[in-house]
Amino acid sequence: MDSTQVKAAVIKQVQQEANLVNARTLIEKLQETCFEKCVPKPGTSLSSGETTCMTSCMEKYMAAWNMVNSAYIARLRQESGH
């Protein structure tokens, strides 16, 4: 393996680890934000209203996350000249 291949492998591994951290962060924020908003009094199960609220909240949060991520990636590409 030459130095170019080693560098590419390291970059790929770092990107995968960063993606994993981002996914974990997203899940944690979804749980915190949506659960606090939609489930004021936790019980043994979610009511239909709580389930609907959680679904809606998660969809909105994911859409916002994707929008921010896309803008961030576009900016990185622009700055790197791609």
Curated annotation (Swiss-Prot):
<keyword id="KW-1015">Disulfide bond</keyword>
<dbReference type="InterPro" id="IPR004217">
    <property type="entry name" value="Tim10-like"/>
</dbReference>
<dbReference type="Pfam" id="PF02953">
    <property type="entry name" value="zf-Tim10_DDP"/>
</dbReference>
<comment type="subunit">
    <text>Heterohexamer; composed of 3 copies of TIM8 and 3 copies of TIM13, named soluble 70 kDa complex. Associates with the TIM22 complex, whose core is composed of TIM22 and TIM54. Interacts with the transmembrane regions of multi-pass transmembrane proteins in transit.</text>
</comment>
<dbReference type="GO" id="GO:0015031">
    <property type="term" value="P:protein transport"/>
</dbReference>
<dbReference type="GO" id="GO:0005743">
    <property type="term" value="C:mitochondrial inner membrane"/>
</dbReference>
<keyword id="KW-0472">Membrane</keyword>
<feature type="short sequence motif" description="Twin CX3C motif">
    <location>
        <begin position="34"/>
        <end position="57"/>
    </location>
</feature>
<protein>
    <recommendedName>
        <fullName>Mitochondrial import inner membrane translocase subunit TIM13</fullName>
    </recommendedName>
</protein>
<comment type="similarity">
    <text>Belongs to the small Tim family.</text>
</comment>
<comment type="function">
    <text>Mitochondrial intermembrane chaperone that participates in the import and insertion of some multi-pass transmembrane proteins into the mitochondrial inner membrane. Also required for the transfer of beta-barrel precursors from the TOM complex to the sorting and assembly machinery (SAM complex) of the outer membrane. Acts as a chaperone-like protein that protects the hydrophobic precursors from aggregation and guide them through the mitochondrial intermembrane space.</text>
</comment>
<feature type="disulfide bond">
    <location>
        <begin position="38"/>
        <end position="53"/>
    </location>
</feature>
<keyword id="KW-0813">Transport</keyword>
<keyword id="KW-0999">Mitochondrion inner membrane</keyword>
<keyword id="KW-0811">Translocation</keyword>
<keyword id="KW-0862">Zinc</keyword>
<keyword id="KW-0143">Chaperone</keyword>
<keyword id="KW-0653">Protein transport</keyword>
<keyword id="KW-0496">Mitochondrion</keyword>
<feature type="disulfide bond">
    <location>
        <begin position="34"/>
        <end position="57"/>
    </location>
</feature>
<dbReference type="InterPro" id="IPR035427">
    <property type="entry name" value="Tim10-like_dom_sf"/>
</dbReference>
<dbReference type="GO" id="GO:0046872">
    <property type="term" value="F:metal ion binding"/>
</dbReference>
<keyword id="KW-0479">Metal-binding</keyword>
